Amino acid sequence: MVLGEGAAVFALEKGSSPRALATIRGIGYASEPITHPVAISADAEALRRSMQQALEGIDPKEVDVVIPHATGTLKGDQAEYLALAEVFGTELPLLTTNKWKIGHTFAASGALAMEMAVLMLQQQHFLLVPYLPATPERPLRNILINATGFGGNAVSVLISEK
C-alpha cells in the first residue's frame, strides 16, 4: 500500500440545482463483524450490501464505472472484487482508481474518489489505470464509488450526470 495525503470538499443541495455538477442517485451503507479492526471480511459482505443498497431500483447494467476502495492489499482487493462480481455478475463495469497516482489517503480517499467521478462525468473522460486498459463503449452517465472504513464499515454512492 502506498500512502498519500489529500482533501476534497463538496457543497450538497437538496433537490435539483442549475449549479449542480452531478446528482447523488443512490447511497448504501453496511457494516459487518470482522476479525481485525482494519480489515474487511474475505467475502466483503458489507461492501456487497452497500453496493446493493446504492443500486436499489437501478439496473446494474446502467453503471458505467466503479471506483473501488481497492487499497492495494491482496486480501482486501480480492474481497472487493468478489463483492463486485456478486453485484454485477460477469459484466463488470469499467474499473478505475486514483490510488495508483496519489496513494491511499485514508479518510479523504472516498471524497477524492467522488471528486474524480464528478470530473469524469463533467469531462466525459474515463481515467485509465495503467494495468487495466479499458475504453468506455458509451457516454459516462453513472459512476459508483466504494469506500470502506475501520471497523467493518462500507459506503457506496452512485452519482449521475446532472
Where are the language model's segments positioned?
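Charged helix-capping and loop-helix junction motifs
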Residues: E80-A83
